[in-house]
Regions:
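Feature captures hydrophobic
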Residues: 1-153
Length: 153
């Protein structure tokens, strides 16, 4: 047995400094508010995002939830845009295990695929729709965070 201290990474119940936690909450909250606008904008500007939006089709509803935090975001795909719709029943739910994990993904410090492999979040819904949402999010995240090490592969 090694006497090396175990890494705290991956521990869901870890605590962060209160000020950093506040900044993370604000950052993630702002991105959740902007999510329908960003998804609509990229569905117009990016051919790949447009193809994924067309694949998902009108009526598809995505819900993003973060365990331990009372904010969720539900967006519905209409013919050419994404709109916020709290009352819609989600087709696919992405559930982050905690705020730190959501922040890591939304700040570009880890890719969506790596976060899924590390179980930062779970998905509930049809796999084909989950893959399409992953591609759509990758277009958005890579545009903003292409300069980050995790997206320079």
């Amino acid at each position: 047995m090694s006497n090396k201290p175990q890494s705290k990474r991956g521990t869901v119940t870890r605590h962060t400094h209160p000020q950093r936690s506040f900044v993370k909450r604000v950052y993630v909250a702002v991105l959740l508010v902007l999510l329908p606008l960003l998804m609509s904008l990229f569905s117009v500007l990016s051919k790949r995002a447009r193809n994924e939006t067309q694949y998902l089709r009108s009526g598809f509803t995505l819900k993003i939830a973060i365990t331990g935090w009372n904010r969720t975001k539900t967006v519905r795909c209409s013919s050419k845009s994404w709109i916020s719709d709290k009352k819609a029943t989600p087709t696919l739910t992405i559930g982050f295990r905690d705020l730190d994990y959501a922040f890591d993904v939304f700040s570009g410090s880890i890719t969506l695929q790596d976060a899924l492999a590390a179980r930062y979040f779970t998905t509930h819904g049809p796999n084909d729709k989950g893959v399409a949402v992953t591609y759509l999010f990758n277009v958005i995240l890579k545009t903003f965070f292409g300069w980050r090490k995790s997206y320079r592969r």
